[in-house]
């Protein structure tokens, strides 16, 4: 993915369009590396991957254009030559003889003053069809997205070519070669189409959730063929497509095509890659199972909104009108996924309309309440209110033309004054914004209030802007300083909306204090907006911006769901086992007035089984949190289909605690199609070249029992390959802990009650840099008929990759343990389990030969 997901990219594009000085700064061409870098012993920093590719320095995201050419694998990648956050996007370059040992090469394709270089692919133009080389010296051709430095951020497809085997690149003078006038048209992957004898491009129409196919005979002139989608998961934009054939069960006569698409609406509600298996006829792709045709469990209908009325439900406000909607309302994209002729759609006259729709009380008679929901992603927040300030004493409201008396500023923030901005949540017309007209997000510095006496219990802060907590590289924070020590801190939410944060400071009553604003961030969302500071004896309540479906028990919210910023409704299910026999109500709430400030809902049904949402029905390459932008190697010499992904997550990619680099790739995987229970499924395994890193003598254990405890094993290491066969026994949960020590560990286990494999990184080490990082990531998996679980686990200094179910299920997660925590342990909770066999191999660093 070339840019972070919404709302970030739109904010960045708008900001860039409004601030020419920021554009000029970003457009400065980087200085390419002068020579190849083989890092060796330098790759010893904390968290540095030892057998996963990472650049020596700076930011990296999507892998681009991997290809085997003249005895070497070439890997290109999205790269910022000037820093450790997203920006200045160019193509970095590395080479390897074996997919394991990588040498970083000089910068391949740099940004320039007209465009950044976004993702794409590389082909070997053996016949010189492009005319960019000669018959004797045909070119390598990179097909990539040019992201224009224009107000609309137009994205077009361009070419660069190499006549020296990929060492140096020249941009084609006729760029762009494909322009449809869109700002969401990116990430081309090109392959040779044997059926038509021409080049085939798959490229994403990101905001439409479509992949478009084009054909060309010379890589310069492209003809539109067809589109695929929307289909499968559409909770985030579509990016980084790939299309390739695979033989089923190794039989070339039974070849299917696989289309992969990256999206930010995956199984962990974030970064992921989905795939479709189907057929490609040379012009269009047809999925065998697009995951769109679904019949939910039958049940008792509460309301389907199909008779032209709300059926006794009570509407208040302006968002619902007098009757259900027939589908799409004027001014929006088409609504899809609803059942029957009517649904609830609160886009009535636009997103500014607000209100509630409340059902009559009904009795819960079945375990599940299934329904469809769509629209804006604005969850219900407990304790929220109207956004007003409680009674109190104003420290600063930033409504004047200059800073309040006594405030001081340093660095690039010196000279900043409040600016007039129309921000949702603002209590006045002005705000203190560290995004400066001259430098944009690049401005850094501090702003400090005069001393004051703490004479109220709470300090309420109205803030917005970047989410860069204290202690991370490039923080954007507001802090309370008492006796020279920071005692409270808050940051933004990567949002242009202002909302309240509140500190309980009663313990400091009577003490002298200051408020300090720190902006050390220079990348996207590298700024803060502060709308006011207030001392009060009441906590300020965050503004209620929900677009949600809530279940009320005695008037209190006990379940809640929201949309995914999509006009496609999807099934959601609530388990109401604890509420059977109780009287409840459904509330549909639209309290948002900004973008995506509406909710869609339909088909409330009590049932004995849960309905499955699209994310549950879609097919995923990886169920972990850190796998994205997967792309396959062109011209792989062994006839394999090998993919490499970006091992990171857009939610926290610019906050992970690594330095002087930020970003790594997954270990290369080989893909295959196999038949399981009559279905064609995709299986994955690490490429066999991993064996080159194995130490000679593995540790082996057999028949190891464990009951209600953690059993340390006599083996340790930060870079390991583990093969395990575990038997469930009576345990509720069982598995292995890696990077174990000092009270920290990462658990890779199985939950017998839910039937799920999981990676638990809640106690894995450093996790506080983002609120979503400390989490348990789960995926459904059946044990074998004998109650056994086979695992293959790749452990590196800052990651785990878990292969299970004979490669049908993979979970990839980053972790950031203390370097001294290298233990391995067997564990079982709630009963007994057993390791029938364990093999642990130490892996040598790929950076030291």
List the model feature ranges, each with a label.
Residues 37-64, 83-86, 100-134, 166-192, ...:
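Surface loop/turn signatures of beta-propeller and other carbohydrate-active proteins
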């Amino acid at each position: 993915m070339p840019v972070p997901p919404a709302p970030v990219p739109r904010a960045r594009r708008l900001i860039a369009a409004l601030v020419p000085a920021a554009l000029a700064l970003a457009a400065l061409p980087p200085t390419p590396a002068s020579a190849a870098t083989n890092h060796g012993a330098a790759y010893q920093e904390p968290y540095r991957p030892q057998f996963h590719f990472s650049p020596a320095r700076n930011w990296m995201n999507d892998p681009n254009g991997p290809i085997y050419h003249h005895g070497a694998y070439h890997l290109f990648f999205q790269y910022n030559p000037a820093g450790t956050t997203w920006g200045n996007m160019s193509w970095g370059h590395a080479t390897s003889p074996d997919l394991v040992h990588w040498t970083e090469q000089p910068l391949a394709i740099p940004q320039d003053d007209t465009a950044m270089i976004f993702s794409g692919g590389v082909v070997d133009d053996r016949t010189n069809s492009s005319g960019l080389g000669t018959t004797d010296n045909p070119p390598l051709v990179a097909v990539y997205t040019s992201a224009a430095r224009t107000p609309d951020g137009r994205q077009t497809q361009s070419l660069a070519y190499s006549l020296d085997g990929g060492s140096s690149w020249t941009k084609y003078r006729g760029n762009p070669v494909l322009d449809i006038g869109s700002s969401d048209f990116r990430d081309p992957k090109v392959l040779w189409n044997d059926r038509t004898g021409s080049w085939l491009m798959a490229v994403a129409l990101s905001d439409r959730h479509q992949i478009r196919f084009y054909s060309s005979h010379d890589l310069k002139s492209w003809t539109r063929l067809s589109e695929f989608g929307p289909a499968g998961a559409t909770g985030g934009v579509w990016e980084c497509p790939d299309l390739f054939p695979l033989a089923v069960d190794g039989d070339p006569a039974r070849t299917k095509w696989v289309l992969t698409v990256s999206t930010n609406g995956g199984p962990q509600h974030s970064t992921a890659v989905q795939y479709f298996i189907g057929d490609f006829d040379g012009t269009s792709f047809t999925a065998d199972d697009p995951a769109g045709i679904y019949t939910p469990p039958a049940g008792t209908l509460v309301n389907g909104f199909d008779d032209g009325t709300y059926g006794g439900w009570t509407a208040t406000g302006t968002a619902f009108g007098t009757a259900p909607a027939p589908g799409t309302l004027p001014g929006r994209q088409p609504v899809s996924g609803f059942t029957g002729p009517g649904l609830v759609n609160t886009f009535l006259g636009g997103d500014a309309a607000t209100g509630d729709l409340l059902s009559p009380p009904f009795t819960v008679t079945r375990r599940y309440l299934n329904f469809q929901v769509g629209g804006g992603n604005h969850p219900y927040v407990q304790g929220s209110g109207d956004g007003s300030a409680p009674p109190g004493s104003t420290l600063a409201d930033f409504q004047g033309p200059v800073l309040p008396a006594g405030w001081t500023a340093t660095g690039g923030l010196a000279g900043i004054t409040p600016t007039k901005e129309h921000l949702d949540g603002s209590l006045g017309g002005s705000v203190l914004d560290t995004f400066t007209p001259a430098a944009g997000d690049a401005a850094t510095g501090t702003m400090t209030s005069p001393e004051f006496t703490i004479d109220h219990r709470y300090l309420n802060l109205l803030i917005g802007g970047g989410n860069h907590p204290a202690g991370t590289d490039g923080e954007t924070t507001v802090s309370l300083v008492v006796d020279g020590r920071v005692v409270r801190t808050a940051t933004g939410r990567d949002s242009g909306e202002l909302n309240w944060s509140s500190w309980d400071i009663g313990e400091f009553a009577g003490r002298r204090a200051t408020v300090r604003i720190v902006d050390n961030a220079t990348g996207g969302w590298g700024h803060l907006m502060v709308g006011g500071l207030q001392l009060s004896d009441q906590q300020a309540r965050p503004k209620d911006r929900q677009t949600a479906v809530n279940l009320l028990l005695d008037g209190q919210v006990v379940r809640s769901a929201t949309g995914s910023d999509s006009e496609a409704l999807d099934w959601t299910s609530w388990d109401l086992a604890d509420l059977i026999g109780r009287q409840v109500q459904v509330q549909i709430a639209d309290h948002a007035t900004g973008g995506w400030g509406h909710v869609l809902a339909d088909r409330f049904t009590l049932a004995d089984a849960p309905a499955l949402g699209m994310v549950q029905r879609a097919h995923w390459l990886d169920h972990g949190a850190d796998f994205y932008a997967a792309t396959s190697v062109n011209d792989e010499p062994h006839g394999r289909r090998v993919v490499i992904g970006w091992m990171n997550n857009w939610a926290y990619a610019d906050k992970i605690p690594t330095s002087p680099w930020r970003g790594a790739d997954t270990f290369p995987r080989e893909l295959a199609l196999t038949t399981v229970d009559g279905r064609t499924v995709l299986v994955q395994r690490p490429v066999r070249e991993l064996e080159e890193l194995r130490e000679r003598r593995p540790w082996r254990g057999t028949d190891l029992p464990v009951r209600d405890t953690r059993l340390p094993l006599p083996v340790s290491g930060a870079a390991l390959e583990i093969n395990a066969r575990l038997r469930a026994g009576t345990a509720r949960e069982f598995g292995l802990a890696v990077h174990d020590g000092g009270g920290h560990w990462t658990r890779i286990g199985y939950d017998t009650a839910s039937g799920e494999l999981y990676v638990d990184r809640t106690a894995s080490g450093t996790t506080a840099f983002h609120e979503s990082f400390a989490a348990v990531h789960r995926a459904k998996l059946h044990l074998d008929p004998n109650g056994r679980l086979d695992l293959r686990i790749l452990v590196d200094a800052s990651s785990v990759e878990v292969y299970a179910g004979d490669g049908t299920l993979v979970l990839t997660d980053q972790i950031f343990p203390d370097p001294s925590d290298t233990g391995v342990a067997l564990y079982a909770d709630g009963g007994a389990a057993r390791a029938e066999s364990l093999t642990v191999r130490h892996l040598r660093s790929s950076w030291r030969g």
